[in-house]
Amino acid sequence: MSTVNTVTEQLTRAGQAIEHGSFAIIDEEAGPHAYTDEQWPIVRRMIHANADFDFNGLTRFHPAAVRAGIDLLLGAKARGGAHIVADVEMICVGLSAPRLKHFGVQTHQFISDDDVIERAKAEDTTRALRMAC
């Protein structure tokens, strides 16, 4: 029985084949781009998740962003875990549970919490803005 690298691969051969095929189509359709070898897999996955090729060219990275993210993930378990807070549930649902577990990362979103809703109503603002404060 072979072990699947759940960090970079889908869990099944069929899933891997579909993802690899999709990524090949995206690479072909996107053509040349100005992203680094570290940045392109992120942009390609954004295109894959949204079926929106406009992410190619619109996405910008701080020069240290990718390295900072990798360092955070690699050190998360040693620090007792890490947390991703999102403003919508869809982000949390869209993240791979095996990958999150591998790195010791937990996701959280509070957009539907009663206190967030009540505070947003009281201050006549959005729930996402209330979460950020």
Could you describe each region identified by the protein language model?
Residues 94, 99-133:
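Long, charge-dense
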